[in-house]
Amino acid sequence: MAGKTGIRGAQIQDDSITGSDIDESTLRYPVTSLWSGNDPGTTYTVADGDYVILVSTRPTAQGGIDSAITITMPSASTSGRMIIIKDAGGHSQTNAITIQRAGSDNFDGNPSTTSIQHSSDAESITLISNGNSSWYKI
């Protein structure tokens, strides 16, 4: 693995990857795209397999969903679960992307923070769960 980044001599037990090297060229991350061809309407609930969510709120003629959207996070009960939400259309200042908690979870450990606004055009927000009740921006 000279010149590569990865895990040498991997031995991940429960999901059984034993005795082989893993390098970053073999890693793939699930991507969900929300745009005019896959328009969820004004709400989307993060699915179990979601990791990267690309959202285009641009006008429909430009390939977007042409509306604000609320994305509901899953429970923060899985420690280390990471979700990346990207304003792929660069239009979130016009059509906001709101990220909503699940149940009684919160953001950044603040019980009164039940949602966050993603309103920076073309930016992404990375959230990671503490395994208890909070999603943290990192």
What is the role of each PLM region?
Residues K4, D14, S119:
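Small/polar loops that bind or transfer phosphate-bearing groups
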Residues R101-D121:
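Terminal beta-strand-rich extracellular "head" domains
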Residues G6, Q13, D21-G103, N130-I138:
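Exposed extracellular interaction/assembly regions and N-terminal maturation sites
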Residues D121-G131:
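Extracellular disulfide-bonded cysteine-rich modules/repeats
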Residues T42, Y51, T114-S115, E123-I125:
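Residue-level detector of solvent-exposed, low-hydrophobicity positions
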Residues M1-A2, G9-A10, S20, T113-I116:
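Parallel beta-helix/beta-solenoid repeats that form elongated, surface-exposed shafts/blades used
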